[in-house]
């Protein structure tokens, strides 16, 4: 839900607890023998937050299916979804840096440890934007276990409801250099104005973000039945990316979509004979319009 203008939170409450939940999912996925991702910093960060629920969850003392009133398949789908999303964006950064990008911006970085765990090329600068207490918590916790950034890490202390583009420029962002931007799982928490705050970025910059899907719980469960690879292919169709000259996060990025015909027959075959409802295809084509002061463009993803 959109955040109020004056709400407060930390990593144990409100939207901050969501960051801890995602980190717990990465910790569980790291232990998964399928080995899709390896985030050795997720578990110590979750433990440091100290929420009993998530600590017990990563210790295997809590059955998320029972606790959350979910079927075992859907509970696992939630964890698999976090793993696949993490891998997808990890690969995005690797592709960007393989193409010569040496400047990265992570919006609402939370407990994201990519600045510490990805093999960044020499000279890569990773900007992490978040509230001071969140950044300081992560920095202190990881320093306490001897972790060191694998890139030049620059932290930007600011709430995304404030003038973060100006703060980013003040922190040293080179507006003439191609930049890889990431908005992972955070657009839905912002009111419209911060989502439309523009920042100048160089040609050949890229942005990727995860957007909300209708009936996400069922979509996750269905999509994971064929395994990680099929899920990854389908997830790729729900993320969006574009290349542009002047950049602005679209105001409708978290909500707009183009639906396709219901696929009740397909879903019934996948869910079993007890499923009788019609469902809008959870992976429709999606057109995102990139607006700027000088030009407009759109991309179907």
Curated annotation (Swiss-Prot):
Gene Ontology molecular function: methyltransferase activity
Cited InterPro entries: Ppm1/Ppm2/Tcmp, SAM-dependent_MTases_sf, SAM_mthyl_Trfase_ML2640-like
Pfam name, any one: LCM
Positions annotated to bind S-adenosyl-L-methionine: 130, 159-160
UniProtKB keywords: Methyltransferase, S-adenosyl-L-methionine, Transferase
Enzyme class: transferase
Signal peptide feature range: none
EC number assigned by the record: 2.1.1.-
One record GO biological process: methylation
The keyword Transferase belongs to this UniProt entry's keyword annotation: yes
Domain of life: Bacteria
Functional description taken from the UniProt entry: Exhibits S-adenosyl-L-methionine-dependent methyltransferase activity.
PANTHER family: S-ADENOSYL-L-METHIONINE-DEPENDENT METHYLTRANSFERASE YKTD-RELATED (PTHR43619), S-ADENOSYL-L-METHIONINE-DEPENDENT METHYLTRANSFERASES SUPERFAMILY PROTEIN (PTHR43619:SF2)
Family: Belongs to the UPF0677 family.
Entry protein name: Putative S-adenosyl-L-methionine-dependent methyltransferase MRA_0733
């Amino acid at each position: 839900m959109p955040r109020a203008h004056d709400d407060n939170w930390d990593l144990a409450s409100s939207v901050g607890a969501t960051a801890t939940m995602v980190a717990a999912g990465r910790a569980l996925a790291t232990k998964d023998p399928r080995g899709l991702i390896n985030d050795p910093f997720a578990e110590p960060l979750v433990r440091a937050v100290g929420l009993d629920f998530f600590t017990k969850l990563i210790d295997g003392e809590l059955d998320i299916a029972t606790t959350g009133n979910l079927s075992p398949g859907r509970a696992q789908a939630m964890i698999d979804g976090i793993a696949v999303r993490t891998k997808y964006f990890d690969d995005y950064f690797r592709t960007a840096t393989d193409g010569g990008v040496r400047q990265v911006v992570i919006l609402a970085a939370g407990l994201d440890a990519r600045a510490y765990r990805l093999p960044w090329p020499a000279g890569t600068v990773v900007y992490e934007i978040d509230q001071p207490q969140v950044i300081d918590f992560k920095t202190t916790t990881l320093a306490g276990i001897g972790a060191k950034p694998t890139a030049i890490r620059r932290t930007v202390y600011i709430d995304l409801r404030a003038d973060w583009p100006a703060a980013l420029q003040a922190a040293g962002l080179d507006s003439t250099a191609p930049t890889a931007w990431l908005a992972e799982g955070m657009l839905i928490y912002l009111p419209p104005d911060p989502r439309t705050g523009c920042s100048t970025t160089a040609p050949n910059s890229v942005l990727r973000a995860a957007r909300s899907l209708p009936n996400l719980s069922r979509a996750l469960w269905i999509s994971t039945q064929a395994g990680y690879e099929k899920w990854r292919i389908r997830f790729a169709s729900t993320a969006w990316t574009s290349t542009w000259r002047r950049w602005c996060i679209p105001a409708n990025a978290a909500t707009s979509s183009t639906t396709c015909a219901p696929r009740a027959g397909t879903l019934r075959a996948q869910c079993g004979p007890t499923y009788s409802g019609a469902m809008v295809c959870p992976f429709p084509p999606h057109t995102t319009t990139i607006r700027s002061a000088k030009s407009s463009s759109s991309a179907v993803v």
